[in-house]
A protein has these predicted regions:
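Nucleotide/phosphate-binding catalytic cleft detector across ATP-hydrolyzing
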Residues: 1-14, 18-205, 222-223, 233, ...
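Extended, folded domain segments that form the structural surfaces/walls around functional sites
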Residues: 9, 195, 207, 300, ...
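Acidic-glycine-rich active-site phosphate/pyrophosphate-binding loop
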Residues: 29-30, 207-212, 216, 335-351
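Core structural elements
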Residues: 78-81, 210, 326-327
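Conserved phosphate-binding/catalytic loops in two-lobed NTP-binding clefts
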Residues: 103-104, 341-368
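Glycine-rich phosphate-binding loops at beta-strand->alpha-helix junctions
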Residues: 159-160, 260-262, 317-341
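Glycine-rich phosphate-binding loop of actin/hexokinase-like ATP-binding domains
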Residues: 201-243
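Hydrophobic alpha-helical bundle architecture
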Residues: 307-327, 341, 347-353
């Protein structure tokens, strides 16, 4: 029997909803998808609840209409500069007199790693496990093996309760749905755009959104870092509006139709016309001026990323290179600027074969990744046997942030 599941991304520029059907063998088909402009967000966080909620509700309704079905719960993306990550570690001595590892030994090490108290007003969103060590050697599953000590770590991300509550409230109270899980936008998009082989080789995925840029870095197949940079495509629009003295709608049009990450020789002689109105009239702008403004902000963004990651930007550890996705990755030449600033090979991420070409666009990486994340082995795969919905992690989170 197939199972219907949903995904929602409350993005800075658009709210997106997706409906998927999971078959008994675990395959996923996208049966409905819709998006609506979202004027209730700024830098990945809700600033006008009603506008954000209306955009989500409209996109969900349209996606359900397209699919011919309804959803009861959704996977919800979470981003924003309020999110913070750190590596938490724990260890446990093997309790058996024979030094044979048991499941309880592993549980004790995990509890120690997760024991750290978060600050008041904050809650953990993700605990993402990194390699397990048995007597200092990495192992996939130590249970049943012989050794003396288990060490493990989690990349743990916490967030501001108020920001989390707002996002949950849009789904649970306004849309009347359950949240199956809250997933970092960076993890969702990297799950979609960087397959297991790339993650094992080591890769950095940079998701260039409208309000923020999400980062996820993998080493040896495991998450080693996630982060959110408060710079996105809207900043380019704002820069063009101020620098060229045009209204933001015109600036957005200039960015999309004529923008480049860096100017080239041909731009010096090319002129772009803005068809104005009775107030401003028509105007001509050198294309080089557009590229110059964009270039400054793009360089600044990648310089911030370079400073943020520091020693983590190690070519020997990131043999899979750096991938760009998100709507901002469509900017011509952006991979070349990124490579020059970061000092590593950078390319635009490509979707795996089999994704509907109409859906396989960079700006859809996160919402598609929400469902594909659940299909991978992250403790509770989508379409698994009909277990009772897990109240554990998410139930505790909802309780802590005041959602019943």
């Amino acid at each position: 029997m197939s199972k219907i599941i949903g995904a929602v991304e409350i993005g800075t520029s658009k709210a997106k909803a997706l409906v998927g059907e999971v078959t008994e063998n675990g395959s996923l088909s996208i049966v409905g998808m819709a998006s609506r402009p979202n004027e209730g967000m700024r830098k990945g966080e809700i600033v006008d609840f009603r506008k954000a909620a209306d955009a989500v509700h409209a996109s969900l309704e349209e996606a359900e209409k397209m699919s011919g079905t309804t959803v009861d719960s959704v996977y919800l993306a979470q981003t924003g500069t309020h999110l913070r990550g750190e590596m938490l570690s724990g260890s446990a001595s093997v309790s058996s007199s024979e030094n044979r590892v048991s499941a309880s030994d592993l549980t004790r090490a995990a509890k120690e790693a997760k024991h750290k108290e978060h600050e008041e007003g904050r809650s953990y969103v993700h605990h993402i496990r990194t390699p397990i060590l048995l007597d200092g050697n990495p192992v996939e599953d130590p249970v049943g093996m012989f050794g003396k000590k288990i060490d493990l770590s989690y990349w743990s991300v916490d967030g501001d309760n108020q920001a989390i509550r707002q996002a949950l409230h849009v789904i649970t109270n306004y849309a009347g749905l359950d949240v199956a899980d809250l997933i970092l936008s960076s993890i969702a998009s990297s799950t979609m755009m960087a397959g297991p082989d790339l993650r094992r080789a080591g890769t950095l995925v940079i998701d260039l959104g409208a309000g923020v840029t999400d980062l996820s870095l993998y080493r040896q197949g495991f998450v080693a870092y996630t982060g959110v940079i408060p710079v996105g495509g809207d900043h380019l629009t704002g820069d063009l509006s101020m620098g060229l003295r045009v209204l933001e709608p015109y600036a957005e049009k200039l960015k999309i139709e004529h923008g480049k990450a860096s100017p080239d020789a041909s731009d010096a002689d090319e002129v772009v016309w803005i068809i104005g109105n009775k107030t401003i009239g028509d105007r001509s702008i050198p294309r080089k001026a557009i590229s110059d403004v964009i270039h400054v902000r793009i360089v600044e963004l990648f310089e911030i990323i370079s400073k943020e990651l520091g020693a983590l930007l190690d070519p020997d550890e990131l043999k899979g290179g750096i991938l760009l996705t998100g709507g901002g990755s469509k900017l011509p030449g952006i991979e070349n600027v990124a490579s020059k600033v970061l000092g590593m090979p950078v390319r635009k991420a490509a979707f795996a074969p089999g994704i509907d070409p109409q859906l396989a666009t960079p700006e859809n990486a996160t919402v598609l990744g929400l469902l594909h994340y659940g299909l991978e082995d992250h403790g509770r795969p989508i379409g698994d046997k009909d277990d009772e919905p897990t109240p554990g992690f998410f139930g505790k989170l909802a309780g802590m942030v005041g959602i019943s």
